[in-house]
């Protein structure tokens, strides 16, 4: 069994970019400042999977100064990473905590789990998504950004 941890954070920006979380478009008046689509959930999962498999981090594999990753759908990046890992491991579970004040995502969590499970070709019951507010504290609490943390357990096959 191998365990990996991932984290990602993006600030909300003035330039509107759709808010994508776990591969799902979430209606909101703000988007994130990012090179790719800025999907903090997928980015934290990618880093946790890379950590569990000792394959580095998202910034090394997909540098933010490479034009081919400009506005790329992060689900594509997740599939690329999983294709490197799936020969040796299967998903034990993935646990994600999203930190944000708004929008509320509870009505989207099942759809997010389904999207992630489709990318990873695993069952939805091994993926957990939850969100926490920052109670008005810090930049996220002031609605200036969004962050995600993920822990992945990989099992050798």
Swiss-Prot record:
Binds 1 divalent metal cation per subunit. GO terms for biological process: isopentenyl diphosphate biosynthetic process, methylerythritol 4-phosphate pathway; terpenoid biosynthetic process. Keywords: Isoprene biosynthesis, Lyase, Metal-binding. 4-CDP-2-C-methyl-D-erythritol 2-phosphate binds at residues 8-10, 35-36, 57-59, 62-66, 142. The keyword Transmembrane helix does not apply. Signal peptide: none annotated. GO terms for molecular function: 2-C-methyl-D-erythritol 2,4-cyclodiphosphate synthase activity; metal ion binding. Its cofactor is a divalent metal cation. HAMAP family: IspF. Homotrimer. Involved in the biosynthesis of isopentenyl diphosphate (IPP) and dimethylallyl diphosphate (DMAPP), two major building blocks of isoprenoid compounds. Catalyzes the conversion of 4-diphosphocytidyl-2-C-methyl-D-erythritol 2-phosphate (CDP-ME2P) to 2-C-methyl-D-erythritol 2,4-cyclodiphosphate (ME-CPP) with a corresponding release of cytidine 5-monophosphate (CMP). NCBIfam families: ispF. This is 2-C-methyl-D-erythritol 2,4-cyclodiphosphate synthase. It comes from Wigglesworthia glossinidia brevipalpis. The lineage of its organism: Bacteria, Pseudomonadati, Pseudomonadota, Gammaproteobacteria, Enterobacterales.
């Amino acid at each position: 069994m191998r365990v990996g941890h991932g984290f990602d954070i993006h600030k909300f920006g003035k330039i509107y970019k759709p808010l994508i979380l776990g591969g799902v478009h979430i209606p909101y008046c703000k988007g994130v400042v990012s090179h790719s689509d800025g999907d903090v959930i997928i980015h934290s999962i990618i880093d946790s999977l890379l950590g569990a498999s000792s394959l580095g981090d998202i910034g090394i594999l997909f540098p933010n100064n490479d034009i081919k990753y400009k506005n790329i759908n992060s689900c594509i990046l997740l599939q690329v990473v999983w294709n490197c890992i799936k020969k040796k491991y299967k998903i034990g579970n993935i646990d994600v905590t999203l930190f944000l004040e708004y929008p509320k995502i509870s009505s989207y969590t099942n759809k997010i789990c389904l999207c992630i499970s489709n990318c990873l070709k695993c069952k939805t019951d091994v993926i957990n998504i939850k969100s926490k507010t920052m109670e008005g504290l810090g930049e996220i609490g002031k609605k200036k950004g969004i962050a995600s943390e993920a822990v992945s357990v990989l099992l050798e096959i």
